[in-house]
Amino acid sequence: SLSTADPGVFSSSNSGQPIPLESLRGMDERRVTQTFGRPVFTRSDGPSRLLRFRSDACDLDLFLYQVGGGWQGRHVEARDPRPRGLPVNRCAGSVAAQKRSA
């Protein structure tokens, strides 16, 4: 879920610049893949599509919904296998930075 956890607890070898939540919501599918690269997992579930991206620090789940003729981000979650708070904007920056360095 959306977390505003203390950014001091987030660490990544490619931390990148945090990406504001407002820009993740409303991002079209083309821009999503330009920013984060190829998803490591996709799933269609009724009216939504899940695209999962991964960095060394987190998984970023973007849920896209059909708007007009295309898909657009409506919900985003950051997940961490370790039990700690995870700020979504920092996770998004990490995933984007890792894509650029690949």
Positions of predicted regions on the chain:
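Residues within mature, well-folded domains
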Residues: 1-102
